[in-house]
Amino acid sequence: MTASLKAIDGSAELTTLMTDLGRQARAAARTLALAPPEQKNRALEAMERAIRAGADKILAANAEDVADAKAAGTTSAFLDRLTLTPARVEAMAEGIAVVRGIADPVGTVTESWQRPNGMTIERVRVPLGVVAVIFESRPNVAADAGVLCLKSGNAVILRGGSESFRSCRAIHDRLVQGLREAGLPDAAITLVPTRDRAAVGLLLAGLDGSVDVIVPRGGKSLVARVESEARVPVFAHLEGVNHVYVDRSADLEMAKSIVLNAKMRRTGVCGAAETLLIDRAAATTHLAPLVTMLIDSGCEVRGDQTVQQVDPRVKPASDEDWDTEYLDAVIAAKLVDGVDGAIVHIHNHGSHHTDAIVAEDAQAAAKFLGEVDSAIVLHNASTQFADGGEFGFGAEIGIATGKFHARGPVGAEQLTTFKYRIHGSGQTRP
């Protein structure tokens, strides 16, 4: 039985609570690792129904969180990330349906070969175990992480931001309902039942060996703390200082469409473009139309000296602007010396998240895609496609920007590791 959602008083009680949560999650992970795909899919189907049936309660809980956030004077970008709408709740349910429909990664034989001595060796996907997901303002992460971990046979411990506490609790209630309908343990998806920030430190310490991997979803300070203090492996989800480079060969109308979508579709998501780079050779044809379009669409443009000259509404860019994830209707813009200049700028200022080139020149595109060292690189497409759902994963637990184990959108398959199965017929080693 999981811990009740109650106020926690005192560090000793919190430590006991968190340790118990870890042990329960570890026990649930052993059950999930052996659960057949049909049982996991029954749970996912029940969760999808429960999210839709409980939409009013989820939205009511979210409205309370949003009201508190507004009273605290939070930014519009933060409020956008925090806010749920009927459409966003429906998207949550639809995401669960997609996850249910993807192939179960657990037990998949990824490679098989036979040795000269007759032994057969297989590499097989297996769950990671217990995943701790620490996130900030986005309540939908609770659903995404919960269902992806379930699909991949992992137990998950969710620790959402205090600002989204009620929303996460309402979503978690529906996920647990689905687990119960399928006969799976409640502790397969656990929500840390307190706003106490000390709970994060206990998670980072690994809960006495119960946590196998930590996934942080949030701003630079959260990710930095996790990477600094964690005693278990981390799938780092760094900030998205994302670039769109418009090459001299770019079709102007395509460039305008991509740049506008990459920046303004949703400014508060990690796939939003934060810097616009324009080929100096295209300055006379592409610069003014792109800058004017952005400003007329409500986006503040901060530019270098040349960019400032094309529209009096452009504000001067500071050195800090080239390294900033705004998550708001603000973009930095500058001219660069062709694709090589764009690559150098991204190397110096990017966050290895998502970067795009708009170009008709196939050689320029190939150079950009090959040399920009980011988890996601795009040719003639918006950076806002940096999303597990758009990759066909149904959802994502984060965008991993590191290079070990997982990179890019972390879906169900990326939440597995592997083991080797060896079949012999009495072989002994000479």
Swiss-Prot record:
Its EC number is 1.2.1.41. Coiled coil: none annotated. PROSITE patterns: PROA. One of its GO terms (molecular function) is NADP binding. It catalyses: L-glutamate 5-semialdehyde + phosphate + NADP(+) = L-glutamyl 5-phosphate + NADPH + H(+). Pathway: Amino-acid biosynthesis; L-proline biosynthesis; L-glutamate 5-semialdehyde from L-glutamate: step 2/2. InterPro entries: Ald_DH/histidinol_DH, Ald_DH_C, Ald_DH_N, Aldehyde_DH_dom, G-glutamylP_reductase_CS, Glu-5-SA_DH, GPR_dom. GO terms for cellular component: cytoplasm. It holds the Pfam family Aldedh. Disulfide bonds: none annotated. GO terms for biological process: L-proline biosynthetic process. It is found in: Cytoplasm. Keywords: Amino-acid biosynthesis, Cytoplasm, NADP, Oxidoreductase, Proline biosynthesis. Catalyzes the NADPH-dependent reduction of L-glutamate 5-phosphate into L-glutamate 5-semialdehyde and phosphate. The product spontaneously undergoes cyclization to form 1-pyrroline-5-carboxylate. Belongs to the gamma-glutamyl phosphate reductase family. This is Gamma-glutamyl phosphate reductase. The gene is proA.
